[in-house]
């Protein structure tokens, strides 16, 4: 009976560690997509959008989220548009 307490705790700990590792890998992948080309993408989009709307570079934010294996969601937020 005492042995069961230790075994179940190990299984719980292993399960928890596995969940944490999956979360860490998921966040790292998300960070990679956001960090690798995001600054250049933001600059390029700013130039294109500035042709049509007067905006300040610091008022624009871009988020990229990977939803599926071959699907990225691009979200652009612009505040104080004039």
UniProtKB/Swiss-Prot annotation:
Q: Which GO terms describe its biological process?
A: cell division; regulation of division septum assembly
Q: Sorted alphabetically, which InterPro entries does this protein's record hold?
A: MinE, MinE_sf
Pfam families, A to Z: MinE (PF03776)
On whether Acetylation is a keyword of this UniProt record, the answer is no
Enumerate the UniProt keywords alphabetically.
Cell cycle, Cell division
Q: What does this protein do?
A: Prevents the cell division inhibition by proteins MinC and MinD at internal division sites while permitting inhibition at polar sites. This ensures cell division at the proper site by restricting the formation of a division septum at the midpoint of the long axis of the cell.
Q: Identify its protein family.
A: Belongs to the MinE family.
Q: What is the designated name of this protein?
A: Cell division topological specificity factor
Q: Which organism is it from?
A: Buchnera aphidicola subsp. Cinara cedri (strain Cc)
Gene coding for it = minE
